[in-house]
Amino acid sequence: MSDIDDHVKETLSEVRKVGANYEEHQQEVGLDIPVDLIHFKKFPVVDSPGKYMKVGHDTRSDISPDDSPELPDYSGPFNGSLRFSDFSKDALINMLEMSDEYYRVCIEGWAESVAERYGRDDMHRIQAEAWRDTILPQLRGMIDNWMELSDDEAEALISETQEEVEAQVEAGGVILVNPYKPKAEWKQYSKERLVKLALGSHEFLLAAIESWALVIVMRDGLDEMFAFQWTLWSEKLLPAAKDIKSRWMKISGDPVEAFMKDIQVDATSFPGKAFEMTFEMPEKEVGVFTFNKCVSVDQWEALGRPDIAEKASHTSCPAAIIETAKMYDPNMKVEILAIPPRVSKDEVCCKWRLSIRDESDPEYVRPGEGSAKT
C-alpha cells in the first residue's frame, strides 16, 4: 500500500487535474513523495539540457474557417501548420468519433489491466472512485469551457451523465460514459463549435485517464503507477490507437510522414491546457515534433520535483513513441533531442526526431529479421 501522507495526497489530487493553476501549487520545498529514482530505464538523449528553447505555437487550435481547404480527412500531404479548422465539418465529426473510440479503448484497457492486477471487485471500486472524486467534479468546468451550453443545458447534461454512470455501475461493467460522444444534431454546428468540442473531448479523455492513474498512486504509490502505465501502453493500447486514427482520419503517406500526421491527430495530445506542440519535416524522411507544454512536466516542476518529471518522461513517452514508430516501419529511428529535467521553463519539455535507418546502420532490420533494437 502507498505510504503517501494525507497532505501530499490532497496536493496531488489538486495539481493533477487538467488545467490546474500550477502557480497556486508551486512548492518552495519539493513535495515529499516516495519514489524510486534509481531503478528505471533512462533512454539516451542526443543533446544536453538547455539547448532547445520554445519557438512557435501550436496551430492546431487556431480557428480560421474562412480560408479552410475543407480537408475530408488527413490522407493528403503532411502540414506542419495544420489547423483542425482545415478539416471539413464531416471530418471534424469523424475526429470526434475517433476521440470517443480512443477514449473507450483507453478506459477498457485500464479496466482490464486493473482487474488483472487487483481483481474485478477492486476494479469496480477504483472506477467508481475515479468518477466520483475526479471526473464528475471537473465536468461542469469542461462543459463551460468547450460546449457552449446554457446553465440549464449544462446541468441537464451533468444529470444525464450521472444517471448513465450509476446505471453502468449497477450493471457491473466498465463505465464508458462520454458527454463528448457525437450526437446527430452536432452535424448542424458551426466549424468553430466542432473544433472546440474536439478540444474538449481531449480534455475529458485526459481527465478520465488521469482519474484511474491517480487512484493507483493513492493506493500503491508512484512506482506502481509508472510500471502500470508502461505495460498498459506498450503492450495493449498502442496497436488499437494506431488503427483508430488510421480508420477515422485516413492517415497515409511514407512512414515518417504518416507517423507525424498520426501524432498531430492523436486525441491524447490535442492542444489546450495540457499540451502545446510544433511539427516540422525538414527533409522527406525526417520529422521533428516538440512539446513546448506538457502537463506532466508542469505538474512535477510545480511540486518542486523535476527529478520525478524526469522519471515520468522516461517511463512513459519513449515506450509509446518507439513502439508506434516500429509499427509504421521497423527501421524508423527515434532520437530524443531533449527530455526533462529542464534548465528553465523557457526550454521545451521534450523534442523528438524521426528518420529511417539505411543498411549501414548497425540496427538496420532486414526483411524477415524482426524489430530493431531499442
Regions found by a protein language model. Name each.
Residues C317-I321:
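Long, well-ordered alpha-helical scaffolding segments within enzyme catalytic domains
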Residues S2-V288, V295, Q299-S316, K326-C349, ...:
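N-terminal accessory segment detector
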